[in-house]
Amino acid sequence: LKSYWNGAAQLITQKLDEGLDVSFITLGDPSIYSTFSYVAHRIGNQGYCVEMIPGITSFTGCAASAGITLGEKDEIILVVPKVDERLEELLKHADTAVVMKTSRHSLMLEELVCKDPRDKKVVSVQNCGMDDEEVFEGFAKKGKYLSTTIVKFK
């Protein structure tokens, strides 16, 4: 991936050196788990000015598509980019957990969530904001990369 980030940064800086304005379009918000950050660091480290304009995060888009709120009052919202061994401990402290890129590890996620004795509602969204967006109850098992699962503990 580093070669792609370096290539993108090189292309952008070439255009900037030509006096052009350049935009980097990304899905979601550029400050949250985005390729933008890797490219922007490379450009900024070369002395160029980088402006970041916020977008709608994919996980808040997913919540809106599912018609659910992520947090109210003093609820703790956990947002993680993937399923791994750290998640079990983190879930204990969350009132709502948002787990991104879940389809490849949905069985592990389901096992971890089911270990928690609290009542819960599980909603998954795949390809949020796209023409083939899907929202459904339960865990994402269809293998789509842009899968997010939201767990609301009660």
Where are these regions (language model features)?
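General beta-strand structural signal in soluble alpha/beta enzymes
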Residues: F24-T26, M52-G55, V99, S124
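Generic secondary-structure signature for well-ordered alpha-helical cores
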Residues: Q10, Q14-D17, C49, I68-G71, ...
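Class I SAM-dependent methyltransferase SAM-binding "motif I" and its flanking Rossmann-like core
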Residues: S31-H93, A140
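Generic beta-sheet signal
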Residues: L20-F24, I77, D95-M100
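Electropositive phosphate-/nucleotide-binding environments in soluble metabolic enzymes
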Residues: K2-A9, Y33, I56, D84, ...
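Alpha-helical scaffold segments in soluble metabolic enzymes
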Residues: L11-Q14, G61, S65, E89, ...
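Class I S-adenosyl-L-methionine
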Residues: L1-Y48, V135-F139, S147-T148, K152-F153
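A contiguous loop/helix-start segment that scaffolds small-molecule binding in enzyme catalytic cores
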Residues: L91-K154
